[in-house]
Amino acid sequence: MKQGLTRHWAAVPLMAALAIDGGTALAQTATGKGGAASGPLAMPADYTLVWSDEFDKGALPDESKWAYDTGMNKQGWHNREKQYYSGPRAENAALKDGRLVITARKEALTTQADWGGQQYTSTRLITKGKAEWTYGFFEIRAKLPCGQGTWPAIWTLGSQGDWPASGELDILEHMGQKPDWVFSTVHTTSGHGGHGVGDGRKLATACGGFHNYQMLWTPKEIRFGIDGQAHAVYPNLGKGTAQWPFDKPQFLILNLAIGGDLGGEVDDRIFPIGYEIDYVRVYQDKR
């Protein structure tokens, strides 16, 4: 496993682990170990803004804040994904009307030295080496793409060590094949891939409008929510780094994958298709 930048899902994908039935998303773990949550989720009053991108300057993503992750293009990305992630290229990532738009396209960039045979292009942006955080309140306002085969995500990876030992926090994952559902999941040595800990929430307007996807990460727990309402929680059980590697920095990732274990079969009629991010904001307790 390459340090920090890649992940493998278990043979049983997340969709199977979450077991959607009759409009209810079932938590992946027993009560007390994490899973479903409810109630309000708000930024603590004593937190202050420490990092943000409002996507209101320039034409392309700010490379003082973001790097383009293209490292697995030649050999192919994990999870059987079908996209080629491009470098700086307005066709795949551009700033428009104060928003970042990540666009997936049906095209093959055969002239690129790292092309691995992919028939789709997209972008994966990371803050690794530019901005990393331990604890905080994260808020990303986004409108998700809806199309069979899309797999947009907002997530973090540990910057120290390999996956899953360094941890992964999926603030949001969405699959075009389940357009009314969004998911948040935590991956660690003690539970990863199809055995990650988290829950899903039905959100009928996930594709139709903007929503605030949120994570409150403290030394005691990690809580995920949408528009100020919590839906998943992961507690620190005091069982060591296998269960809680989250006392070390994580970096942020924004990407739009195509196909793969969660994206599913791809409908080529959906392209080009865009994933819009209005802003990314990180707050911390700086007292």
Language-model-detected regions and their locations in the chain:
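Bacterial N-terminal signal peptides that target proteins for export
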Residues: 1-12
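Residue-level micro-sites within transmembrane alpha helices that shape
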Residues: 6-7, 20, 172
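Bacterial N-terminal signal peptides
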Residues: 11-21
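GH16 jelly-roll
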Residues: 28-287
